[in-house]
Amino acid sequence: MAPLQFQPLASQPTPAFWAALAAHKLNHLKLDDSHLPITAQIEPAKRVLINKERVDDTADVGIDGSLVVGGDAFEAERGRLPPNAVSVTGTLKIFNTIEEFKDTSAKKRLFDDLVSQMLESFDTDRPVLNPFLLVTFADLKKYVYHYWFAFPALVSSPAWVMDGEFMPVDEIEDIRKLAQSHFQHNTTAFLLKGAAPHLSAAPLSSCSTFYDKTQSEMVTVVFHDTSSLPSNPGWGLRNVLYYLSAKHGITSLVVICLREGSSSTQASLSLSSPPSTAPAKPPQAVGWERHPSGKLSPRVADLGPMMDPTRLAAQAVDLNLKLIKWRLLPALDLDKISGTRCLLLGAGTLGCYVARILMGWGVRNITLVDSSTVSYSNPVRQPLFTFSDCLNGGLPKAPTAAKKLQEIFPGVNAQGVVLGIPMPGHPISSSDDAVEKDVAKLEALVKSHDAVFLLMDSRESRWLPTVLGRKWGKVVVNAALGFDSFLVMRHGAGAGAGARRIQSDEGGVGEKGLGCYYCNDIVAPTDSLSDRTLDQMCTVTRPGVAPIAAAMAVELLISVLQHPLGVHAPAERPDTAETSTSTKTSPLGCVPHQLRGQMYQWKTQIVEGEAFDRCTGCSDYVLNEYETNGFAFLRRVFNEKDYLEKVTGLDELYRESEKVIEGMEGLDWDSEGEE
């Protein structure tokens, strides 16, 4: 009599599983390649009726069950399973390189270890009869997954044979209800005895005590069958038969193959010959899943063509950033970076480069503000514009730059606002309501963003955003260019609790806090745009200075965001950051106040500057005056050249200095005192 043949189990990993695997590898496992448990479900076979060419002509077609691995494979608590599905646990091994995945010895070790664990479980009351192994290599850049499933099955010797044919089961619905009430999707096979309506069930480990030996009760096994073939049960029965024979001495039994609908069958099985009395040898195990071509080889799942291109781009952008956390900076908070809303005042050379680098860091919300249009000289220096943007008078810079950002990466929320920024020393009409609306719009923009970049091409245009940024406690990063020099700095946040923690004895900047762009000035900002020659009106700089300054400006912001004190982070130098024992540091290193670069000398200096209590941009005099009088204060600043100096007391300070100088005019600095 021919040995009983079994239908191999088929794997069915879903796209949701591969997405969950990619996220788990990228965000949690990283370089950890130790194996881990996952859950799946075994779905039984079923038979369906399909219509042929004639209406009255139908065919009964069998559909095999499978092992379905879904998106919840890594979750401890699984969702609701289909009515006749069974939950099983397996082992997942994600290799870090394709070479490791191709190593056959590594896969053999994993398979043998799983077989050993299964055999050890036979000595417990919870034998593991349906383990599975999944080895894979995930190419997360291309969304290609190389994988191979194994369903270890122990080879019974002697083999099992059928005593007759497989027959339909009359009491199948009673058996199905019994399985659901007793085992609740947790077992693939169980023992059965009695007749309807007095059926009873027990786990396989109770085989020695469940049946009455005096009555010669036949052992009956019910198992969830994944095979739709009439005379070949599913792969999972192999381990059940081996376990009952090896651990409980069963040589004959009745098996009920539980399938969907009315297609379940039953048959009597027995060993083809008496078991050997020779010392037991380790059983042989088989079970690697074959490729659809019939070969014993891995499979490949390529999800790239299936994914939405926009979502694909978003995941690809995040991939490089998340890889930083694998080995280099595990403490990097990428969510804080991506959630930061950035306002870029100026969409010229600096604005274009800053926007691109912010996108590289994963920033998703960028608003650009500019009032000018694209000119023919812009595209070669401003990478978001092309020649076509210059035609017919030129497109507005801010909306055009925002559109180009979305073309580069559709996942970015980029907005462009055409807005002129009122400036000190640039008079306005007393009835000019448009300026007041511009101020209100600018203040609303500053208020609704987390970080503000000052990237304009004049000194006085930075004044109003400086005041607004200080008022609303925003991170303000300023970048300014010379011919072969640049300044990148962050504005201080005032004398808050965080700002007062700046070290003074160890080389810090004292307790006044960090200064702003105007804290070193002893005169108010005024009109610097009028009465200029052509070389003064155009931005004349070495072309490489702007991208260097833009990169430093963005990196300074990111370092501030990663610091525990955020906008209140103290000014640090590389030497003090390395020797500091404080835990309140940025994982990206020291967070300086100012960076002053000189291309002529190839030098970048770290500078610290205290807040000036009479500063025209961030002092309490200015903030209180704006808080009290609002736009009326601003109108006087725009129209009256010396008004800011009066508000802050700089004029009085200047007069006092003049008196001191006048009082020193009669002194003879060259004479020496007599002893």
Swiss-Prot record:
Q: Which family does it belong to?
A: Belongs to the ATG7 family.
Q: What is known of its domains?
A: The GxGxxG motif is important for the function, possibly through binding with ATP.
Protein name per Swiss-Prot or TrEMBL: Ubiquitin-like modifier-activating enzyme ATG7
Recorded hits in InterPro entries, A to Z, give:
Atg7, Atg7_N, Atg7_N_1, Atg7_N_2, ThiF/MoeB/HesA, ThiF_NAD_FAD-bd, Ubiquitin-activating_enz
Where is the protein localized? Cytoplasm; Preautophagosomal structure
This chain's source organism reads Cryptococcus neoformans var. neoformans serotype D (strain JEC21 / ATCC MYA-565)
Role played: E1-like activating enzyme involved in the 2 ubiquitin-like systems required for cytoplasm to vacuole transport (Cvt) and autophagy. Activates ATG12 for its conjugation with ATG5 and ATG8 for its conjugation with phosphatidylethanolamine. Both systems are needed for the ATG8 association to Cvt vesicles and autophagosomes membranes. Autophagy is essential for maintenance of amino acid levels and protein synthesis under nitrogen starvation.
Any one GO biological process: cellular response to nitrogen starvation
Q: Which SUPFAM superfamilies match?
A: Activating enzymes of the ubiquitin-like proteins
Taken from the UniProt record, the cysteine pairs bridged by disulfide bonds within this chain are none
Q: Which domain of life is it from?
A: Eukaryota
According to the UniProt record, where is the region Disordered?
Answer: 268-293
Q: Which GO terms describe its molecular function?
A: Atg12 activating enzyme activity; Atg8 activating enzyme activity; identical protein binding
